[in-house]
């Protein structure tokens, strides 16, 4: 019988748990449970009262240099007392594990875990998240990692090329995306770079990557997309997600105001950064649509099709553009 190559697999939680039990010297009562199969696969390790998350990177998603740079960043932030989920060494002093999966060797890292996710949270917590993001940026300002730099090419051009594989160019949605891409590229090219802080960005701070304890302590995790770029990209993405999750406008505006106040209690947002936030938010939509297309074979195929993309563009991307970018143009 012919053997066929594998592009993706889900490793059974039980042997993964035994592997980690040996590597990290967990107790014999430690358990391992599959949490999520997404861009990477996550496993919850519970040993007594302690929880950990083991991230198993998809094949060829991140190389060892990129993972080491993420680890270096997290350790730097932890050393500066910033509440992040941090990597843990095994008994031999190693951070990165190599697991022989059917598709090839996959890398894994064990992270600390504390608190739980919340879809909606208080105005005060948004203020605290703003403070925490600013503290991260204070540390990462002018820092550079050996990872991707999020240029307009990466955000808008590369992502749009991937989208072309899934939506015909003559559809209304693709024609709108093409026109919007040109507008955004032109605007970003004219941005006053001297007034835009640069450094290392998280790129994915939203409720799904925040854990909150019962006493209101916030931990930021999942730095898988960290890289180099304008620091205001993180602000733009958080605001974008706030618009997506908070449907009552008055409550959303109050929480947004609190988030920005929290941020600016630590670090000043320049007028040029504020001007670009709506445009960068739309650019982030472009980028993550591109990621979904890039990872069709081993993630997004369960939902990604032409109908999904048309709805996403009309109900999220275009709506956000009209309500924020176009509105700002009309005001000015």
Where are these regions (language model features)?
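Conserved NTP-binding catalytic cores of kinases and kinase-like/nucleotidyltransferase enzymes
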Residues: 1-89, 214, 328-332
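ATP/Mg2+ or Mg2+-diphosphate-binding catalytic cores
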Residues: 4, 288-332
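Active-site acidic catalytic loop and adjacent metal/ATP-binding pocket
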Residues: 38-49, 53-54, 87, 185-233
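ATP-binding pocket architecture of kinase catalytic cores
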Residues: 48-145
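A glycine-centered beta->alpha junction motif in the catalytic cores
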Residues: 93, 104-120, 161-168, 288-302
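A cross-family kinase active-site recognition segment
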Residues: 120-175, 198
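Active-site activation/catalytic loop segments of kinase-like enzymes and analogous catalytic loops
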Residues: 232-267, 283-299
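All-alpha amphipathic helical-bundle segments outside canonical DNA-binding/catalytic cores
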Residues: 269-281
């Amino acid at each position: 019988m012919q053997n066929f190559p594998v592009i993706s697999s889900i490793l059974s939680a039980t042997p993964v748990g035994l592997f980690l039990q040996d590597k990290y010297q967990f107790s014999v009562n430690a358990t391992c449970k599959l949490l999520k199969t997404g861009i990477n696969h996550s496993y919850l390790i519970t040993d007594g009262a302690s929880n950990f998350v083991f991230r198993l990177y998809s094949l060829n998603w991140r190389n060892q240099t990129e993972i080491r740079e993420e680890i270096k960043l997290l350790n730097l932030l932890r050393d500066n007392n910033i509440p992040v989920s941090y990597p843990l060494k095994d008994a031999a002093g190693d951070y990165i594990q190599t697991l022989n999966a059917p598709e090839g060797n996959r890398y894994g890292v064990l992270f600390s875990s504390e608190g739980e996710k919340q879809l909606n949270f208080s105005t005060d917590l948004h203020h605290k998240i703003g403070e925490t993001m600013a503290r991260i940026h204070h540390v990462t300002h002018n820092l550079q990692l050996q990872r991707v730099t999020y240029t307009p090419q990466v955000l808008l051009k590369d992502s749009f090329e991937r989208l072309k594989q899934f939506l015909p160019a003559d559809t209304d949605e693709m024609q709108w995306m093409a026109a919007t891409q040109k507008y955004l590229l032109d605007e970003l090219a004219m941005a006053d770079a001297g007034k835009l802080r640069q450094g290392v960005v998280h790129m994915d701070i939203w409720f799904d990557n925040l854990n909150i304890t019962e006493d209101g302590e916030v931990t930021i995790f999942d730095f898988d997309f960290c890289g180099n770029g304008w620091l205001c990209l993180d602000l733009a993405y958080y605001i974008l997600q706030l618009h997506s999750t908070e449907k009552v406008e008055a409550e959303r505006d109050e929480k947004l105001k609190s988030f920005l106040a929290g941020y600016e209690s630590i670090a000043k947002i320049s007028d040029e950064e504020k001007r670009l936030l709506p445009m960068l938010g739309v650019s982030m939509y472009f980028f993550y649509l591109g990621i979904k297309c890039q990872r069709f074979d081993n993630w997004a195929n369960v939902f990604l099709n032409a109908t999904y993309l048309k709805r996403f563009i009309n109900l999220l991307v275009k709506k956000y553009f009209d309500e924020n970018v176009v509105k700002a143009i009309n005001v000015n």
